[in-house]
Amino acid sequence: MTALKTEQNIGRITQIIGPVIDAVFSPNKMPNIYNSVVIEGKNDVGDTIKCVAEVQQLLGDNVVRAVSMSATDGLMRGMTVVDTGAALSVPVGKNTLGRIFNVLGEPVDELGAVSTPEGMLPIHRAAPAFVDLDTNLSIFETGIKVVDLLAPYRRGGKIGLFGGAGVGKTVLIMELIVNNNIAKAHGGVSVFAGVGERTREGNDLYQEMCESKVIDTANLANSKVALVYGQMNEPPGARMRVGLTALTMAEYFRDVNNQDVLLFVDNIFRFVQAGSEVSALLGRMPSAVGYQPTLSTEMGSLQERITSTKTGSITSIQAVYVPADDLTDPAPATTFAHLDATTVLSRNLAAKGIYPAVDPLDSTSTMLQPWILGDDHYDTAQGVKQTLQRYKELQDIIAILGLDELSEEDRLTVARARKVERFLSQPFFVAEVFTGSPGKYVSLAESIQGFKMILGGELDDLPEQAFYLVGNIDEAVEKAAKL
């Protein structure tokens, strides 16, 4: 939280509409935009109330309009509002690892206060200067076949996981954090921002991290991740700012400790949604599909800070909810522009039981270039895409006339495409309880070798079910022997 100024600038509440608070201050003593203000007092039954809000508008007649970061229950007109004189500030540094925070930087895991020898940093900061940015191109291996082969992630880049409700965005994020031990292999730390998602998911993630020792409950100093949560039940102000709280913690590790940081955001759409709610509460005219007119600016102010400098990097993996599975909706469409790689999850593949339900033809990456990946990887990826694209084109003919009406060449393409489609599935560590199969980490070299063998016709005699939910190609051959 923000330390109060010695000479307090005090106002009074004049109006409360849900999470929006209007307060009047003395002339020439108005708080600045983005200053945090604190309201303390007692409600009707004598309970102490403390509410923190962020100034959003100066309305004239010495009145400011602020958006609350917590519930406004029990607040009354006439209550004292204290201007802290600064933006909301949150704790940073190694003591944040292994802990769970809310938007204000207050620990909510009942493990006591956080000592912050490194101090506090304001959540509103400028993006790094253009000359300080790092332009190095290298791949970030995840151990997930479909990702590493067809839409590889850039180390120090921004990655979006796009999908509608219930197709597996959160499971994919949990897999990337927990059981790949990316944070450990990466030699850095992770920060997880839970933006407007379910409390149950936040709790599940914490338990998973404790079990896999990403969070070491016995010795928090050995932990590799800090968690920042602003769930669905929080006011829109908290959901709109919790991403910035997490980003501020990540920036400290990058800029001061010169570390490589992984920033996970689940879900960036809720950040936009909260901004839309706040925009409406502040009386702004909505733009397309009811979104806030400042959508691009808000998204840019967050995304431009998630970047890699010459001293450290932030690799960001963001889940993006796609309303009604419509990728042209303004929220996902605005997010697309900022990303280096997009992993699109498909409801059709999920319905077929192919998990992770990543659409190999819709997913893209700026890293899929022969001069970055090498010809072997690039040619295999293109071969897989061409085979799947041809299969997609033939599906209408197959539905009407059946497989028998296809030419010999097309029948072979379809058989290989179906094997490729199944081989793109993979058992996850975090989904062991659902699949009954132990999780698998498949190296990039193994992935390339497996797909080359399928496309080259070396495995034409194996049944397609042998390729379903296995790790590398050797496991598929073993499974075929048992069928």
UniProtKB/Swiss-Prot annotation:
Q: Which reaction does it catalyse?
A: ATP + H2O + 4 H(+)(in) = ADP + phosphate + 5 H(+)(out)
The alphabetical list of record keywords is:
ATP synthesis, ATP-binding, CF(1), Chloroplast, Hydrogen ion transport, Ion transport, Membrane, Nucleotide-binding, Plastid, Thylakoid, Translocase, Transport
Keyword Cell inner membrane assigned: no
One GO BP annotation is:
proton motive force-driven mitochondrial ATP synthesis
- Pfam families per UniProt: ATP-synt_ab, ATP-synt_ab_N, ATP-synt_VA_C
Chain's role: Produces ATP from ADP in the presence of a proton gradient across the membrane. The catalytic sites are hosted primarily by the beta subunits.
- Kindly state the subunit structure of this protein: F-type ATPases have 2 components, CF(1) - the catalytic core - and CF(0) - the membrane proton channel. CF(1) has five subunits: alpha(3), beta(3), gamma(1), delta(1), epsilon(1). CF(0) has four main subunits: a(1), b(1), b'(1) and c(9-12).
Q: What is this protein called?
A: ATP synthase subunit beta, chloroplastic
